[in-house]
């Protein structure tokens, strides 16, 4: 198998699972180089995972003729600059979420990719895992009848108690909807279809927050983005959904992250979309009880880089990637739509079109995409 060669830009907190899965799981991928502003981090990653090249700058990676896909794992407000430079250098790009810190950035990246005939896409890819794929199958096969609505909740108290450098979560491109919203919105549109318009209210509950994790314990951060966001979506199908994300609430973890899909004949309880599996429950009134549904698809474990591997397969076979920009752009427009609605007090129309990518193959062979 000819592997697609990847360069990783950014070796921060999320990079570990990507390094592991790219080098040990997905046969479509070959990680040939890493780059980070802190060179020691790149050196450590390269030594641990056998990566042959360490680039001094991202532009060195983009100039490497061996690199086919750039994996952008930088901080959210840096995504646009890195992805844009990679595309202009003629590289395909897979970016961590979000696509950009605002829709204008996503629009520019999409334009460049289309003009140059390059693939652009990105996270989240959790919807390709066993949990969401099984839920999609249940809905598509009619187990809850016609979907009429949804509810999604991500309730948390922020990142300053555990993350080693959490300040970017409260700056441009951060906040609960930009950080965690993409997991929920991506799952929702894969289960329910595209969104037509949105409405929202939001606020900054705590203008200053204190870091309690090491090594920055005691540092006080200014909060620049809304951290309590309640939104309503109207799907193109006519169904109505709600989504609530916050970094401000003390709440038990086991009850704080979920999606529910309501149908004309039943309700589906969807697992945490930040994970690749979890408990799936189905309620149908004629049964009178809620029953647990087993996983029907592969990749129940933490399989981040699955979307990157899918892009590599798409690149070599000529099909569309499942995590393509048409999806990440639609999600970004929804998120910005919430901000616009909260500011204006009006519904915001979502203009981008969205189509669901094909479901994952069954059965799956771990490490090989269909």
For the regions a language model picked out, list residue spans one by one.
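Short acidic low-complexity segments
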Residues: 53-65
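Predominantly a Rossmann-like dinucleotide-binding segment in NAD(P)-dependent oxidoreductases
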Residues: 126-222, 345
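Beta-strand-loop-alpha-helix segment that lines the small-molecule cofactor/substrate pocket
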Residues: 69, 75-127, 142
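Glycine- and charged-residue-rich phosphate/anionic-cofactor binding loop of Rossmann-like
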Residues: 30-31, 290-296, 313-331
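N-terminal Rossmann-like dinucleotide-binding module
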Residues: 1-49
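Contiguous beta-strand/loop segments that form the cofactor/metal-binding neighborhood of enzyme cores
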Residues: 186-279, 305-317, 321, 337, ...
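C-terminal capping/lid region of NAD(P)-dependent oxidoreductase domains
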Residues: 118, 145-149, 340-370
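Active-site loop of classical SDR/Rossmann-like NAD(P)-dependent oxidoreductases
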Residues: 17, 297-308
């Amino acid at each position: 198998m000819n592997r697609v060669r990847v360069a990783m830009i950014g070796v921060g907190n999320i990079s570990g699972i990507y390094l592991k899965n790219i080098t040990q799981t997905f046969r479509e991928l070959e990680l040939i180089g890493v780059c980070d502003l802190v060179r020691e981090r790149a050196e450590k990653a390269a030594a641990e995972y056998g990566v042959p090249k360490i680039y001094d700058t991202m532009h060195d990676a983009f100039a490497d003729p061996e690199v086919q896909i750039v994996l952008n794992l930088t901080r959210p407000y840096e995504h646009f600059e890195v992805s844009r430079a990679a595309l202009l250098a003629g590289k395909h790009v897979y970016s961590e979420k979000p696509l950009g810190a605002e829709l204008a950035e996503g629009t520019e990246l999409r334009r460049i990719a289309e003009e140059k005939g390059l693939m652009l896409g990105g996270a989240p890819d959790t919807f390709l895992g066993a949990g969401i794929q099984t839920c999609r199958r249940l809905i598509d096969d009619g187990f809850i009848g016609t979907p009429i609505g949804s509810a999604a909740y991500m309730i948390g108290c922020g990142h300053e108690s555990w993350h080693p450098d959490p300040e970017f979560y409260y700056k441009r491109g951060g906040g609960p909807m930009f950080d965690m919203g993409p997991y929920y919105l991506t799952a929702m549109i894969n289960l329910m279809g595209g969104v037509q318009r949105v409405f929202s209210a939001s606020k900054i509950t705590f203008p200053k927050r204190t870091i309690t994790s090491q090594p920055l314990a005691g540092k006080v951060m200014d909060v620049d983005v809304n951290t309590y966001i309640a939104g309503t979506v109207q799907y193109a199908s006519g169904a109505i959904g709600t989504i609530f994300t916050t970094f401000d609430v003390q709440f038990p973890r086991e009850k704080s992250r979920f999606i529910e899909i309501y149908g004309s004949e039943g309700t589906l309880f969807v697992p945490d979309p930040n994970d690749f599996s979890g408990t799936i429950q189905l309620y149908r009134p004629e049964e009178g009880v809620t029953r647990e549904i087993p996983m029907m698809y592969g990749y129940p474990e933490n399989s981040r880089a699955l979307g990157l591997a899918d892009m590599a397969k798409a690149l070599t076979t000529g099909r569309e990637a499942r995590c393509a920009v048409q999806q990440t752009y639609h999600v970004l427009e929804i998120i910005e739509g919430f901000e616009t609605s909260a500011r204006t007090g009006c519904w915001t129309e979502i203009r981008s079109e969205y189509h669901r990518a094909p479901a994952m193959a069954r059965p799956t062979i771990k490490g090989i995409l269909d």
